[in-house]
A protein has these predicted regions:
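N-terminal secretory signal peptides
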Residues: 1-32, 55-57
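Short beta-strand->loop
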Residues: 135-146, 166, 282-294, 303-306
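Conserved C-terminal helix/tail region of periplasmic/extracytoplasmic solute-binding proteins
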Residues: 9-12, 16, 257, 359-388
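Hinge/lid segment of periplasmic solute-binding proteins
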Residues: 126-171, 185-191
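Mature extracytoplasmic/periplasmic domains
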Residues: 298, 303-362
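Early extracytoplasmic/lumenal segment of secretory-pathway proteins
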Residues: 60-127
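N-terminal export signals
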Residues: 25-26, 32-56
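Ligand-binding pocket segment of bilobal, Venus flytrap-like solute-binding proteins
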Residues: 206-210, 214-218, 222-289
């Protein structure tokens, strides 16, 4: 399915593409293009994809410091974009990779991360606000942020108590990947995923080192809510996890290397990893369990402890530029809730069912709930599972 810009927006996706092509061919002036598309304030970051704007990007050079630090997820960025940002500004991008929101929360609470930008998931932002670990954003410093083009359901969690704390990065789903050359059956459910873990795929299965998804999808075996904190339901999920533990290859949120080497044949997975693996190794498929699971959206945000604010704002604004963001998507395969970006993506991506699942599959999914991030019972279940 292809996302379309609503009719009440100032420019449609089709019109945006028409104007972009006209501008690239030199048929219209720079002023005309920027005015018609509403990207006039974004010239500083558009220049990487449009050399005609290059002069304005150089204004950043030397003015934001020598580095910017981002905490993000595995396989979730385009290195060429980071290199371009360094080339344009002189600020080197330092990357910290984490595998769960619990890990990110713990590091921020401990202090001293040195992060300027981090990538929280939708359900965690209200907790960061409550704990005073995140700072509200000054929208005037993010000219590429334009709500008119954004899909509402994926951006709402970024606003808490009327203040904007985070701007959308990507959205996606949590399902599982499997190597169809190794697994001959055709699983379509979480029940089949966990049953295969203990039978035909024993010793070849990975689950996330992340309680939300690993516990959540164990809960789906029993058709409980992905977000359940009910003691009896969590006890059922814990028994399933501990019974499955001897049959696992690994507990790790970075599962691509093992899937590529065929050390693992099946793993809990996110949209973009599923697309990357399927693109490179067609026998690896991505499946959304029919019982449901997780729908999520990730954001760019600035920690309360950030010291390099000029670099943080410049970096976020660069990354949410439609052209830069499209380059991100083409590499990692996670959709963006920004219709300006979708308009720039190739048809083979906008019509790919891994990126844009069928409505009936999406309708069965749940957004993560804030309570799961700090619920002690879920934390205890995950700890006992990992130590079993």
């Amino acid at each position: 399915m292809t996302r379309k810009i609503p009719d009440d927006n100032p420019i449609s996706a089709k019109k945006f593409m028409e104007e972009l092509r006209r501008y690239e061919k030199g048929s219209v002036s720079r002023r005309h293009f920027l005015g018609v598309t509403g990207l006039g304030a974004a010239t500083a970051v558009m220049a990487g994809a449009m050399p005609m704007l290059a002069g304005s990007r150089k204004a950043f050079a030397g003015s934001i410091g020598d580095r910017v630090s981002i905490a993000t997820w595995p396989n979730y960025y385009n290195p060429e974009n980071f290199e371009q940002f360094t080339k344009d500004t002189g600020a080197k991008v330092q990357i910290s990779v984490f595998g769960s929101n619990e890990e990110m929360l713990a590091k921020l609470q401990a202090g001293g991360t040195g992060w300027d930008v981090f990538v929280p998931t939708n359900y965690t932002i209200s907790t960061y606000v409550e704990l005073d670990l995140i700072q509200p954003l000054d929208v005037s410093r993010l000219p590429n942020f334009n709500e008119k083009y954004l899909i509402k359901r994926f951006i709402e969690p970024g606003t808490v108590n009327g203040k904007l704390y985070a701007v959308p990065k990507n959205w996606g789903t949590t399902g599982f990947v499997l190597n169809r050359k190794k697994i001959k059956s055709n699983p379509t459910s979480w029940r089949e995923f966990w049953d295969l873990t203990k039978t035909d795929a024993s010793g070849r299965v990975m689950v996330h080192d992340y309680q939300l998804t690993t516990i959540g999808n164990a809960l789906k075996y029993f058709e409980y809510s992905f977000n359940s904190v009910d003691p009896k339901e969590l006890a059922d999920a814990e028994k399933l996890l501990i019974d499955s533990k001897p049959h696992l290859f690994a507990i790790n949120s970075d599962y691509q290397p093992s899937m590529r080497s065929t050390d693992a044949w099946m793993s809990i997975a996110w949209t973009g990893d599923g697309l990357q693996l399927n693109r490179d190794i067609p026998e690896i498929d991505y499946v959304l369990g029919k019982e449901g699971g997780e729908l999520w959206s990730d954001f760019y945000a600035i920690p309360k402890s950030a010291k390099r604010l000029d670099a943080a704002y410049a970096f976020i604004n660069f990354l949410i530029d439609p052209v830069v963001s499209a380059k991100e998507v083409e590499v990692h395969g996670y959709p963006v809730p920004d219709d300006r970006v979708t308009a720039l993506l190739p048809k083979e991506m906008t019509e790919n069912p891994i990126m844009y699942p069928a409505k009936e599959l999406l309708d069965a999914l749940e957004f993560g709930a804030a309570i799961t991030l700090t619920d002690p019972l879920r934390a205890e279940v995950m700890a006992r599972f990992k130590s079993a």
